[in-house]
Every structure is written in structure tokens, then in C-alpha cells.
């Protein structure tokens, strides 16, 4: 099994090692390199990282599974555009439709493909500032000084309405190499 996100690596190593399953930790920029032989993996999981569908196919055994949860292209789009009227999503092609089509074109069987747009609600301006500062791909060039007028508007909305809500964009896939 392969994984790139450290909290998942720790969890998978702890839970799966007891069952004889080897977990391969990948570097952050791994989408074009998996350190295993072609046709050698029973399963590849992916939590939010970019991936190369052809490489996934090459590394999986026939009948192997690819399971991925992704942050879609439109995650927090309205809030990102509020701060930057020229904002364009960093990963505009990361959609369920395109990802499913890419995998089907490579011969994968799609066992599960679901998307969700849950709400995320902010109850104070500090939470918005923190959130925007830790995900620069959705809030490029964000800073309090640069976005002070928008932050003031959002703070007033929170004072009037108790909160500000944005939409997240998520999808999950479970596939099998045929």
C-alpha cells in the first residue's frame, strides 16, 4: 500500500503492519514516481494528493484497488473569489467527472464515485484568517494587510448574521484495475 500524507502513513503502518501489509511512504511530490515494481501492488490509497492515473494502473496488479478522496476544483471558490476577484482554482481539472473519465479510459472499473459539497461555517474572523493563511493554493497572496477591506466586510457579516458559510468540494473514488 502507498500513502503520502504523514498522519495516514502513521495510522496505516500501525494498523496494517500487524496484518503483514507493507506501507510505502511517498514524498510530497510523488505523482510521477512510486518506488515499487510495475504490477506489484494490491492497493493504492490517496488522500488529497495529486496522482497520475497511468502510473496507478502500471503499479497495480490486475484486480488491484485504487481508493482516493480528493478536494475538488471548486473548494471554497466563493470565499477565494471574495478575497481575489481574479482567483482561478489551482487545480481546475480535479473534478469527479474528469477523474472518472480518465480512469475509465485506462480500463479501470469504477466501484464507487461520489461527490459532496458540504458547508463550512465560520463564526469569527480569526478562524477565516487562520484558514486562508494555511491553504495558499486556495487563497494566493493572502495576508491581513492585503485583504483588510474584505476581512472588515466579512467581520461585519459575522456580527450581523452570526456566521459566514462557504462550500467545500470533495469526491471519493473506489476503482479496480481490470
PLM regions with names:
Residues 1-34:
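Class I SAM-dependent methyltransferase SAM/SAH-binding core
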Residues 9-10, 53, 76:
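Short alpha-helix immediately C-terminal to the canonical SAM-binding loop
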Residues 40-48, 65:
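Short SAM/SAH-binding signature in class I
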Residues 51-68:
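A short glycine-rich, Lys/Arg-flanked "PGG" loop and its adjoining helix->strand segment in the class I
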Residues 109, 115-178:
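Conserved Class I S-adenosyl-L-methionine
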